[in-house]
């Protein structure tokens, strides 16, 4: 018999947890060892495949064939600097796969095997699935799985793939801090009072901070920030480096002379002492067999020393908190509760720094740090599998998450046109209209970027596709509709269509080119740092574009004017060589956007007056009501004449991929629709 509902799984870097909604509450399910959390370890030993506690026990003994940290590899390229750095600390081998991804080599049943991170994660998911089946007495087919808030599209899709491999239909990918907020707020959903909650999710391998507004049954994410490569394992690594330095200094033993088995044992001892120092001020690392004379190696550690070794790690945590507050436009006093999630949030130094930042506020301990994420996932699983309305505790609850970075397309001259802005609530759908830059253009390249800078060359390219079959027409006339849709899993789909040609193309952005959280934050910081210079660069680019259009149009009309020109026309066009010279030799010296705009506006006024005079004297003739009013100004009521519209349509072609890009339609507003 198959269970009609769904389970919730917190697939962690170091530990995982599974829960299910039963009897009006979430039940956290213990594994076959009686533990409510399961190590995210898989061991290929003695012709067996072990998962969880049994696998980790082999790691502690230094056995070969034990794989862990799959979450730090999933969705990443082998060439990723993060992967290259982590490889130095892993006892297992990591190689480059066929498509450039990171794969792990193991020996099993006498054969060498290359395993994808998804396959390792699938083993953990399958084990948790079996634990749930033992608890429920039924087969389980559906689940909600959590990921760090800053996981990119590739990592999210890879996690869904792992669920599929494990025999699960993944109903939803949900962000870990959002799931934890549900665990915190489920009992407060009927209070009605709006509360701003900061979720501090410091796990084994990832770190997220989300600021969530809880009001009645609505959980709305206001901002999220994080680091997908920061967690308790970084503390373990710092302790390991300290121990290796001590061994080298006291005994002259270099790391290279230690076996992988001994390094694995030492790493396990470092993790153990880290846990001890969370509730004791003194601990020690003790290990037999390391020293040549058989003497036991002992290194005493104090909590103060651990805090000293990890100063930079803890500082990184606080900086993420401060960035999240800034993104949410909130101050520390706007936060009612700080919810601690993840085993690493137990570290006393971390809690002390948080209390100091939030001016002595009592940190929330009403949710279990190790179980909160699975708790929220189980609630979401209950709702998505049809349980909505069956429980008075879940009826009326709405979950609203956000995108971490602005996404958009490149338009002519390499400008970044944002379609969905950072921290926009998802699921979300936005549509904008664009057009062509050349006459009879039959195709356009849609290039998709994410970032916070106004020029695409400073942002990160996600992918591109060509929309062909466009109806031949004058440039600016075809209507190209571009739609961005971010689903509830945070995965982006881009669709472009041209109505007359009845052509449509779609791109699902689920590749490994999406940014890591570190790259995202760096881009935000750089955008803030260079905001002024970016504005100036954009102003220069637009000034050149606008004035060149006026100059070209004026010269084209002048060719239709019989010579000699009238005295008035000669005076009107006298600015032209000076205007061209300013664009070519002086514009680049201007250092602020306001002064550029003032100069451009002045030249545009002169160009417009000259163009009107030239039209009157040219082959186009003149029309009643369009005469010069004789005062030398332009107050003749035709400031919105056809020539300006023609100039707006006459955007130039840019350099780039060799394909013509799209251009923005200035008069057409974005059409945004929040999809429920």
Curated annotation (Swiss-Prot):
InterPro entries: ATPase_NBD (IPR043129), Heat_shock_70_CS (IPR018181), HSP70_peptide-bd_sf (IPR029047), Hsp_70_fam (IPR013126). Residues 613-676 are annotated as: Disordered. Pfam families: HSP70 (PF00012). Keywords: ATP-binding, Nucleotide-binding, Stress response. GO terms for molecular function: ATP binding; ATP-dependent protein folding chaperone. The keyword Chaperone does not apply. Residues 630-646 have a biased composition (Acidic residues). GO terms for cellular component: nucleoplasm; nucleus. CDD domains: ASKHA_NBD_HSP70_HSPA1-like. Gene3D superfamilies: 3.30.30.30, 3.30.420.40, Actin, Chain A, domain 4, Substrate Binding Domain Of DNAk, Chain A, domain 1. Belongs to the heat shock protein 70 family. This is Heat shock cognate HSP70 protein.
């Amino acid at each position: 018999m198959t269970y009609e509902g769904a389970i919730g799984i917190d697939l962690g870097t170091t530990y995982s947890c599974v829960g299910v909604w039963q009897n009006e509450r979430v039940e956290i399910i213990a594994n076959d060892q009686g533990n409510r959390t399961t190590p995210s370890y898989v061991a290929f030993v003695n012709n067996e495949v072990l998962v969880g506690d049994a696998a980790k026990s082999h790691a502690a003994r230094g056995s070969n064939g034990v794989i862990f940290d799959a979450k730090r590899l999933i969705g990443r390229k082998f060439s990723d600097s993060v992967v290259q750095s982590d490889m130095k600390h892993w006892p297992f081998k990591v190689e480059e796969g066929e498509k450039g991804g990171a794969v792990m080599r193991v020996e099993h049943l006498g054969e060498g095997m290359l395993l994808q991170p998804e396959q390792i994660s699938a083993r953990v998911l399958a084990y948790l699935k079996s634990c749930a089946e033992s608890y429920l007495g039924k087969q389980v087919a559906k689940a909600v799985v959590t990921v760090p808030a800053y996981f990119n599209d590739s990592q999210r899709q890879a996690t869904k793939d792992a669920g599929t491999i494990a025999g699960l239909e993944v109903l939803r990918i949900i962000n870990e801090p959002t799931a934890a907020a549900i665990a915190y707020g489920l009992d407060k959903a009927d209070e009605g009072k709006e509360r701003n909650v900061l979720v501090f999710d410091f796990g084994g391998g990832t770190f997220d901070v989300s600021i969530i507004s809880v009001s009645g049954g609505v959980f709305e994410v206001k901002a999220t920030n994080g680091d997908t490569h920061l967690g308790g394992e970084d503390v373990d690594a710092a302790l390991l480096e300290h121990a290796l330095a001590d061994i080298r200094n006291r005994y002259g033993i270099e790391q290279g002379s230690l076996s992988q088995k001994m390094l694995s044992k030492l790493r396990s001892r470092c993790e153990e002492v880290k846990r001890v120092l969370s509730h004791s001020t003194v601990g020690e690392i003790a290990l037999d067999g390391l020293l040549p004379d058989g003497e036991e190696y002992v290194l005493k550690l104090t909590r103060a020393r651990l805090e000293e070794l990890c100063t930079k790690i803890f500082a990184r945590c606080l900086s993420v908190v401060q960035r999240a507050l800034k993104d949410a436009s909130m101050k520390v006093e706007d936060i009612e509760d700080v919810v601690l999630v993840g085993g690493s949030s137990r570290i006393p130094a971390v809690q002390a720094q948080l209390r100091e930042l939030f001016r002595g506020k009592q940190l929330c301990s009403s949710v279990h740090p190790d179980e909160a994420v699975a708790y929220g996932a189980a609630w979401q699983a209950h709702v998505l599998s049809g349980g909505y309305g069956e429980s008075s505790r879940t009826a009326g609850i709405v979950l609203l998450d956000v995108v971490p970075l602005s996404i958009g397309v490149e338009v002519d001259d390499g400008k970044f046109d944002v379609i969905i802005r950072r921290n926009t609530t998802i699921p979300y759908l936005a549509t904008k209209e664009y057009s062509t830059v050349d006459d009879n253009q039959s195709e356009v390249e849609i290039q998709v970027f994410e970032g916070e800078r106004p020029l695409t060359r400073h942002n990160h390219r996600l992918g591109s596709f060509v929309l062909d079959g466009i109806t031949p027409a004058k440039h600016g006339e075809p209507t190209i509709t571009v739609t961005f849709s971010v689903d509830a899993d945070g995965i982006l789909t881009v669709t472009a269509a041209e109505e007359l040609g009845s052509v449509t193309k779609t791109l699902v952005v689920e590749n490994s080119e999406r940014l890591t959280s570190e790259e995202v934050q760096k881009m935000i910081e750089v955008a803030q740092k260079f905001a002024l210079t970016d504005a100036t660069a954009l102003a220069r680019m637009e000034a050149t574009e606008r004035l060149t259009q006026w100059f070209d149009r004026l010269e084209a009309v002048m060719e239709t004017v019989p010579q000699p020109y009238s005295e008035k026309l000669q005076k009107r066009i006298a600015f032209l060589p000076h205007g061209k010279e300013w664009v070519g030799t002086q514009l680049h010296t201007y250092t602020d956007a306001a002064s550029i705009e003032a100069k451009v506006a002045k030249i545009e006024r002169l160009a417009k007056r000259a163009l009107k005079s030239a039209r009157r004297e040219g082959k186009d003739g003149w029309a009643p009501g369009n005469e010069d009013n004789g005062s030398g100004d332009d107050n003749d009521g035709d400031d919105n004449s056809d020539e300006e519209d023609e100039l707006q349509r006459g955007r130039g072609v840019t350099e780039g991929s060799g394909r013509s890009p799209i251009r923005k339609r200035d008069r057409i507003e974005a059409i945004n629709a929040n999809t429920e």
